[in-house]
């Protein structure tokens, strides 16, 4: 659809495609993960060495503002993936969330094949991919034209604290 839009229209089109967005109003699986992080339970992410792209809501807003003010020849007809340049592992994300909540990481290492088998048996194979799989977006097209992402740690902390309140 994006390719068709880029070729069929006479207006200048810029496509911004954010990866998983995190922030104070996180929903669905991300919100559930925040709630789980706010328990004393040890979590099975000690061996989760995956790499996943995330982007904070703040960085999405900043990137969109940047794209709307960029010179036309730099952005027109292009697709920009919005993702912070450094992917995070689930282990790192959970550790940052627990730190923001004043909790120790309490991560146990469960081999990936065991987690995959367990989640597949309970009909949650997609959840395994989301928690243990890799998904890295190429952000070079946006950073090449001068956009600078803010570090996401403050937004991770805000998301964790907001989930605690709700």
Feature map (PLM): residue ranges:
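C-terminal amphipathic/interface module of NAD(P)-dependent oxidoreductases
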Residues: 106, 126-166
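Mid/C-terminal beta-alpha module of Rossmann-like enzyme folds, strongest
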Residues: 70-126, 157-166
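PG/GG-rich flexible active-site loop of Rossmann-like NAD(P)H-dependent oxidoreductases
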Residues: 20
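Alpha-helical membrane-targeting segments
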Residues: 32-57, 99, 104-136
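Conserved active-site beta-strand element of glycosyltransferases/polysaccharide synthases
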Residues: 13-15, 42-44, 74
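Residue-level signal for the nucleotide or nucleotide-sugar donor/cofactor binding architecture
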Residues: 28, 52-58, 85-88, 137, ...
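Active-site Tyr-X1-5-Lys
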Residues: 1-14, 24, 30
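Substrate-positioning beta->alpha
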Residues: 26-32, 46-69, 77-78
């Amino acid at each position: 659809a994006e390719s068709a839009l880029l070729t069929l229209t006479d207006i200048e089109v810029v496509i911004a495609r954010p990866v998983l967005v995190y922030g104070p109003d996180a929903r669905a699986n991300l919100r559930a993960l925040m709630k789980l992080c706010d328990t004393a339970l040890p979590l099975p992410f000690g061996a989760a060495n995956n790499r996943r792209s995330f982007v904070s809501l703040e960085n999405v807003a900043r990137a969109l503002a940047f794209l709307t003010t960029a010179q036309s020849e730099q952005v027109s007809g292009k697709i920009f993936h919005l993702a912070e340049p450094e992917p995070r592992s689930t282990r790192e994300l959970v550790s940052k969330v627990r730190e923001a909540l004043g909790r120790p990481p309490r991560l146990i290492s469960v081999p990936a094949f065991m987690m995959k088998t367990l989640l597949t048996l309970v009909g949650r194979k997609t959840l395994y991919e989301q928690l243990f799989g890799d998904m890295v977006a190429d952000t070079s097209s946006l950073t090449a034209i001068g956009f600078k992402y803010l570090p996401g740690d403050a937004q991770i902390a805000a998301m964790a604290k907001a989930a605690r309140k709700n």
